[in-house]
Amino acid sequence: MPISMELPVFSTLRVPLFSRLALLPTFGVPFSSLGATTRLNCTSRKARRICVMCLVRDSAPIETCERAGEDGSDEFIEVLVIGSRKESIMDSCLDSPFPSLPLRFWSISKDSSGGLVLQQRLNHQDNALKTMNPIELLQSRPRAFILVASAGYGSDQVEAINILSAVRSGGNLAVAVLLKPFSFEGRKRLEEVNELARKLQQHTNFCIDIDIEVLLQKDLVTLDEALRNANNAVSMAINAASALISGMHGNFIDVMHKDLKELEGSEVKTILESYKEAKVGFGVGHNLKTSILRAIYDCPFFRPGLKDLNAIICIVASSVPLQKKDVKTILRTFRQTMEYTGDIIVSTVHEPDLEPKVRVTTFFILSSSEVETSNKGNIFSGLVPFVLNIFTRYRSQLQKETNIGLGETPVSIKDSADSTDVKTSNQNIEEFEIDSEDLLEVSENGDDSEYPLKEGEPSRNSRLDLKDENVEDFGAIQREPIANWSMDQGYQIEQKWQADSGDTAVLSLGIVNLPVGVRPSKKLNSNLSVASQLSRKADSREESFFNPNGSTKDSSDTASTLLSEKYADFTKQRNLSARASSMLEAERDSSKRWSPILEMQYRGGLFKGRCQGGLPEGKGRLVLGDGSIYDGMWHNGKRSGLGTFYFKNGDVFQGTWREDLIHGKGWFYFHKGDRWFANFWKGKASGEGRFYSKSGEIFFGHFKDGWRHGQFLCIDLDGTRYSETWDDGVLIDRKQVDAGD
């Protein structure tokens, strides 16, 4: 029976991804084209080509490994996990669908006498506890030792480093997997992990770095989803190193215009020792080309344009057994997709339990501790334009395949570079760019920010232009203080626009008041010590823009003249349905009937975009009479899919819609710099959410029908943590908690 697959948390992935699939990433292979011996002996400084490695294996039953272990013919690969997330990491690794790998998982604990011992973590069915002295573990001469470390490891690092040092000095491979903390966990924990990384450089052969902060920066994901993705990435790295080190699988080198050559196990070890760092990217598709594109563009762990790049490693997993001729087919497909002609090291992973016709591609980006100083002939200079080139070329193709897979109608609308300009009163609004990429991509450049940002927080100055090679994009909705945005056309108009109480109310949204999810009751927190604190926060936000009628009372003759002709006779049609009136407008102008992009009056505003049957369908923008703007996808005349709503006071919502209501995951960017991410159900926040205040405070918790409900975790600017209990928007209790709780 095929293993069930579930969608990953990456926002642009559409094909199911096996949530616990431990893909087998391999490691860098520096070589020249002279011969196998020269390839393996050259240093990373001499490497001048991109390497792509895959792994070919047939899954062996678990009994095979057990018999090998009993005979002593196959040593175990020991995995030691330390840090505050060790339990969840080991749970994820033990749920891996690759039981044939000779892995044993350990944690550090104390025995009855107070001495340190290693406690083995077994699968969920086996409740027996097995312990071992670290000296006994070293005497068993493990083939390799893998340390997985997250923040909060405490004194466990001392024993872990001692074991790593002993394993490496004994001639075996010592590998480290570092899981960096989220930025909201505080600078202290980040410095803690960085300090451990510096120590491990002296005691390990190879280190895999996993920065989980990018999960929250680049994707519309909850904290729980981000943690699961981070654990899956750790499991992938562990299984990859284990598969290579165990020697259970064949590895092949492919040189252009030559046959494949198989690598020996000792050669693989030499290869692994030649690099110091690696980063990961992976994707899933129903064909090899799509999975490769998604591994490059959709995985937040991989960023196109990395400068410390020495080699790329590709692993392709499928449910059908692949032979040597199939490996050549993969090579040919890879070269055609990536337009790459260099030497390649290639194979695949055979996993019978994987869903049929599913291809899982994993990239590993490897770098060396030695930094290249010359740009001439450097692999960096050759790779960055290469990645940017294929990025521009295949992004539209990937979006098209995704839309077809979802049953959406692909729409192609001509782009316009002047989409955000507002013309004078005697001109119409210029044709603007209606592209779903505007809903997905933002710039990372935020040096001009009006408000200071923490390290690692994304920012934005303007929308991306895919033709600009200096701009990076990672295919997911990003978030940043709204003060950094260059507003689209209509924003300057709405600042002085006189509110129109007509049909605009049908599509306009009410302004969200801060703090979010809190009932405006005078009795709120009257008996709590934090009453003054909440009152202070509320007072700081008592400005006119929270009043729906506050910021739009002053009218502008210029703004009124600009769109007066567009709205002159629309009030006469209010007795007609929206569909009938829009069809009449389309028929009155014969020149517009044959245009793929229509401009018409629609439900109290000016719509410009794709239409079908007189109703918006596809991509389009609606400028409402009160100055608010919706820019995004439409279906049957209603907002559906990805879209951005610009409030008349400067706030912005960016996320998913259904039947004219916010439905799904989305971000609110308040124009004062606060940010709020939440899951929405029919227009109301429901489920997990998080709030980032401009002052640096962070709130995590759950919402119910738009109100805070249940437990909330609050982290102040100085790192102090508070646990709050809310009941339908009313604060019940608040107490300080320890950082380790």
Curated annotation (Swiss-Prot):
Its main location: plastid. Disruption phenotype: Small number of abnormally large and heterogeneous chloroplasts sometimes exhibiting alteration in stromule length and frequency in non-green tissues (e.g. slightly increased stromule frequency in hypocotyl epidermal cells). Normal shape and number of etioplasts in cotyledons. Misexpression and mislocalization of ADT2. Formation of multiple MCD1 and MIND1-containing ring structures in dividing chloroplasts, instead of single ring. Slow trunover of FtsZ ring subunits (e.g. FTSZ2-1, FTSZ2-2 and FTSZ1) in contractile rings at the chloroplast midpoint. It is a peripheral membrane protein. Changing residue 632 to A: Impaired interaction with CDP1/PARC6. Changing residue 641 to A: Impaired interaction with CDP1/PARC6. It is found in: Plastid, Chloroplast outer membrane; Plastid, Chloroplast stroma. One of its GO terms (biological process) is plastid organization. Keywords: Chloroplast, Membrane, Plastid, Plastid outer membrane, Repeat, Transit peptide. MORN domains promote interaction with ARC6 and CDP1/PARC6 but prevent binding to FTSZ1, FTSZ2, MIND and MINE proteins. Together with MIND1 and MCD1, regulates FtsZ ring positioning in chloroplasts in an ARC6-dependent manner. Z-ring accessory protein involved in the initiation of plastid division and division site placement (might functionally replace bacterial MinC). Acts as a disassembly factor that accelerates fragmentation and depolymerization of existing FtsZ2 filaments by enhancing FTSZ2 GTPase activity, thus leading to the conversion of FTSZ2 bound GTP into GDP, a process which triggers FtsZ2 filaments destabilization. Prevents misplaced Z-ring formation at chloroplast stroma nondivision sites. Self-interacts. Interacts with FTSZ, CDP1/PARC6 (via N-terminus), MIND1 and MINE1. Part of a complex made of ARC3, ARC6, FTSZ1 and FTSZ2. Recruited to the middle of the plastid by CDP1/PARC6 where subsequent complex made of CDP1/PARC6, ARC3 and FtsZ proteins can form; this complex enhances the dynamics of Z rings during chloroplast division. Binding to FTSZ2-1 is enabled by ARC6. This is Protein ACCUMULATION AND REPLICATION OF CHLOROPLASTS 3, chloroplastic. It comes from Arabidopsis thaliana. The lineage of its organism: Eukaryota, Viridiplantae, Streptophyta, Embryophyta, Tracheophyta.
